Curated annotation (Swiss-Prot):
GO biological process, one term: protein refolding
GO annotations of cellular component type: cytoplasm
Lineage, broadest ranks: Bacteria, Bacillati, Bacillota, Clostridia, Lachnospirales
Major subcellular site: cytoplasm
Keywords assigned: ATP-binding, Chaperone, Cytoplasm, Isomerase, Nucleotide-binding
CDD domains assigned: GroEL
Catalytic activity: ATP + H2O + a folded polypeptide = ADP + phosphate + an unfolded polypeptide
EC number: 5.6.1.7
Family to which this protein belongs: Belongs to the chaperonin (HSP60) family.
UniProt binding sites for ATP: T29, L30, G31, P32, D86, G87, T88, T89, T90, G413, N478, A479, L480, D494
Organism: Lachnoclostridium phytofermentans (strain ATCC 700394 / DSM 18823 / ISDg)
PROSITE patterns, A to Z: CHAPERONINS_CPN60
Entry's localization field: Cytoplasm
Protein name per UniProt: Chaperonin GroEL
Length: 541
């Protein structure tokens, strides 16, 4: 396919037009008075959203050079979303400001390579200033405020804070579409895995078809149990203690299963058998998780342990276990707290090291099960269009909250960038030539998010920026009430991680954009002409 090539200013100007088209579409959503964007879908109803990355991903421009510029800025939004889960609009606005300001300096004869160096130094300085302003998140109230600012909805903030409060910061919170108009929170406490009883006759509640065991012993093994003689010694100890038993094994079959069911029906003792969750190495890891959670030992040939010699000391304990046809939930395992913490740290280290998204997801599930449980937020709305919009807001809010827990919070509403710019200004004064110009590009770009928030509220951005710059650190502009307030006290909070990532990713793409000296694009082939129609019919003849 033939290519079209543009050089220097021609290439950059064409790409800048694409950057502006994408950024101007995204920037209308920023701030408490930001609007929504309607996205046409090839099937189904249009999607209405204020999520920067969702909008950016939909944009493809007809002109190849403009499209290249748009795709570069799309990468800013995507990368920020991957790292922090929120702040995609802010990142796009920052990148646009840097590119527009940088283009003016290139036209005036600045060297892009040295500009880039100055931009990098200024960004590092701003990131340091943001980190120094950051403070740890305190309590459920601040979590709710972070989520509410991200979603632009206080009720969303409350629900995310409730979910996080109940399952701890390491718990899994999933967001699903509800079948009703109500948005509700469901909580699964303890460790849940998707394996149920091996026989329906083991149910203790025949109406609900589930088995409920209070303070049971838990036998954990990776073996297949088919001969009752293998577990007879431990069963005798269970009967003598008058307790109930949960067996988690690779499988329970044949004579062993028959004997357990008959004794359960006769009322001799209550034993429920469950197949071990997972497969292969993941099964071994999950059995070990259950053992650590309940204070038991995995009876395995690898450890030189035999079922016939198992004692009550090697069995786990839990406050209660609920077993359904396809699910088992272990609540309040009696494992050693220090060992559970050590296991959690080990899984976190594995999450940090793995590059596979699938492995990461499975490890996070294991982490949540050990750390506290699973919360499900079911998003309800009157129409599917509204539901999808609410779900996207909820996902952003959850990501922002996780980022806040991870790296702390700072004053929101773009004010942190203004106060960080005071440090960047000091740095710029020490630099010379095009390096100083590069730092000044960042200095100017740091004003863009607050200016954009003010513009979306129908106000003059430059005036608001100058007034905030005169205030002490932590004071900013509340675009909803149009007052200058202490942002943290007023509940306008941003996660430090989101603020930092947005700036770093914007600088990365903008500085690369400015060093572009040629652009190569495919020449689009014209669509083939419609073939001629066939000859006419005989008509009425």
């Amino acid at each position: 396919m033939a290519k079209d090539i543009k050089y220097s200013a021609d290439a950059r100007v064409a790409m800048e037009a694409g950057v502006n088209k994408l950024a101007n579409t995204v920037r209308v959503t920023l701030g408490p008075k930001g609007r929504n964007v309607v996205l046409d879908k090839s099937f189904g109803a249009p999607l209405i959203t204020n999520d920067g990355v969702t909008i950016a991903k939909e944009i493809e421009l007809e002109d190849s050079f403009e499209n290249m510029g748009a795709q570069l800025v799309k990468e800013v939004a995507t990368k920020t979303n991957d790292v922090a889960g929120d702040g995609t609009t802010t990142a796009t606005v920052l990148a646009q400001a840097m590119i527009n300001e940088g283009m003016k300096n290139l036209a005036a004869g600045a060297n892009p390579i040295i500009l880039r160096r100055g931009m990098k130094k200024a960004t590092d300085c701003a990131v340091e200033a943001i980190s120094s302003m950051s403070s740890a998140i305190n309590g459920k109230d601040q979590i709710a405020k972070v989520a509410a600012i991200s979603a632009g909805d206080d009720s969303v903030g409350e629900m995310v804070a409730d979910a996080m409060d109940k399952v701890s910061k390491d718990g899994v919170i999933t967001i699903e579409e509800s079948k009703t108009m109500q948005t509700e929170l469901d909580l699964v406490e303890g460790m849940q895995f998707d394996r149920g009883y091996v026989s329906a006759y083991m149910a203790t509640d025949m109406d609900k078809m589930e088995a409920n065991l209070d303070n049971p012993y838990i036998l954990i093994t990776d073996k297949k149990i088919s001969n009752i003689q293998e577990i007879l010694p431990v069963l005798e100890q269970i009967v003598q203690s008058g307790s109930r038993l949960l067996i988690i094994a690779e499988d329970i079959e044949g004579e062993a299963l028959t004997t357990l069911v008959i004794n359960k029906l006769r009322g001799t003792f209550t034993v429920v058998g469950v197949k071990a969750p997972g497969y292969g190495d993941r099964r071994k890891a999950m059995l070990q998780d259950i053992a650590i959670l309940t204070g038991g030992t995995v009876i395995s040939d690898e450890l030189g342990l035999d079922l016939k010699e198992a004692t009550l000391d090697q069995l786990g304990r839990a406050k209660s276990v609920k077993i359904q046809k396809e699910n088992t939930i272990i609540v309040d395992g009696e494992g050693n707290k220090a060992e559970i913490e050590a296991r959690i740290s080990q899984i976190k280290a594995q999450i940090a090291e793995t590059t596979s998204e699938f492995d990461k997801e499975k490890l996070q599930e294991r982490l949540a099960k050990l750390a506290g449980g699973v919360a499900v937020i079911r998003v309800g709305a009157a129409t599917e269009t509204e539901m999808k919009e609410k779900k996207l807001r909820m996902e952003d809010a959850l990501a922002a909250t996780r980022a806040a827990v991870e790296e702390g919070i700072i004053a929101g509403g773009g004010s942190a960038y203004i106060h960080a710019s005071k440090e960047v200004a000091k740095l710029a004064a020490k630099l010379e030539g095009d390096e100083r110009t590069g730092a000044q590009i960042i200095l100017k770009a740091l004003e863009a998010p607050l200016s954009c928030i003010a513009q979306n509220a129908g106000l003059e951005g430059a005036v608001i920026v100058n007034k905030v710059r005169e205030k002490k650190t932590g004071v900013g502009f509340n675009a909803l009430t149009e007052k200058y307030v202490d942002m943290v006290e007023d509940g306008i909070l941003d996660p430090s991680k989101v603020t930092r990532s947005a700036l770093q990713n914007a600088t990365s793409v903008a500085s690369t954009f400015l060093t572009t000296e040629a652009a190569v694009a495919s020449i689009k082939e014209p669509a083939p002409a419609m073939p001629a129609g066939g000859p006419g019919g005989m008509g009425m003849m």
